[in-house]
């Protein structure tokens, strides 16, 4: 086993629909997909301290709202859809994450997180600047641009 405490693959994910009757989406497969992709990319140590938290419904048992990257699974017209929040912090500098905009279908979440991490690596001021510090310095807009670049017009939607 490889130690991953504090790395992108050290994800807190409430089990979601796999084990909870209140949940509206699955969290375990999303967490597994993200962890596997981060290991494939081999950038976990470069990324460093990153708290990814996933909840399977609005009850927020996975504490997505205080994840540096938070993922909230919802039911949208019978399909699992995942909202992304950024900038949450559960430490003494507590902050609730901000929604990035429209959610993503289950099959796009891993790529979404990968785009966020790629944006972070490009935006950070140096190797020692964490995801959360980078987010606080540059704000939401550059991350939204990375997430929603494929939409018409090439930019992020306004909320």
Label each residue range with its predicted role.
Residues 1-79:
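Small-residue-enriched alpha-helical segments and adjacent helix-cap loops
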Residues 7-17, 48-60, 128-144, 148-152, ...:
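A glycine-rich phosphate-binding loop feature that marks nucleotide/adenosyl-phosphate handling sites
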Residues 20-28, 99-106, 133:
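Hydrophobic alpha-helical scaffolding
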Residues 23-26, 64-66, 73, 81-83, ...:
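Generic alpha-helix signal with a bias toward terminal, lower-confidence helices
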Residues 37, 112, 119, 134, ...:
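Residues that form generic nucleotide/phosphate-binding pockets
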Residues 42-44, 121-128:
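Surface-exposed helix-capping loop/turn segments at secondary-structure junctions
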Residues 67-125:
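Mobile "lid/hinge" segments at catalytic clefts and subdomain interfaces of large enzymes
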